[in-house]
Amino acid sequence: MIDQAKAPRQEASPPSKFEHKVTYVPPRTKFAFGMTEIRDLAIATLLVSGVGLSMLGFELLNIQPLLVVLLLALFTSTFLMHEIAHKITAQHYGLWAEFRLTLIGAVITLISIISPFFKIIAPGAVMIGGTASKETIGKTSIAGPLTNIIFCMLALALTFVQPSSSPPSPFVVVAVVTAFFNAFIAVLNLIPIGILDGWKVFQWSKIIWALAFTTSIILISVLLAQYGSLLGFSL
């Protein structure tokens, strides 16, 4: 039981002549897209899809138009899920997060479309704002590549659903290309240099970075060893 002492009675203060109203409401961290973000994502998606098509071998360039459309949709999904994973994770920790196109990144990605050997996919990044610890930044950074690793594993597993044939069925082609594209983006982003995701993950946890990077390397190695000719690589 709590016995609360009564305070001495005080006279009410006179009413104030001043009034106030709320003129600023802090932005909520709910999951939403701004118009600038949508525009930048649309441009970046076109660039990424262009790089994806340029990575296909000559055998895949002669496939049915419907299959090309499906592959473009998968390239788009791969890129968007990577960036959205960053965004959702950042907002989960109460941070402001929106994707922004960067000029140098967009130019490098554009060059990668026409270059037969130089392939870098970095049209922009999810910008975050707010106070964040090294752990929060690390978890936000690993979210994108981890999403790609999961999608790669799922797509690779689908290749075992249908018996192998020569030439491979459209189903296998889509699964293999999807797996390879996800593995490629994961490996690229996990390189521990500069502004890439890998450097932020490495600074947070070297063990988690090593596990993620090693897994992505193994996945892309398996795909190249098993389906190198399908992907246009001579191994």
Stretch-by-stretch model annotation:
Residues 1-235:
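Hydrophobic transmembrane alpha-helices and their immediate loop junctions
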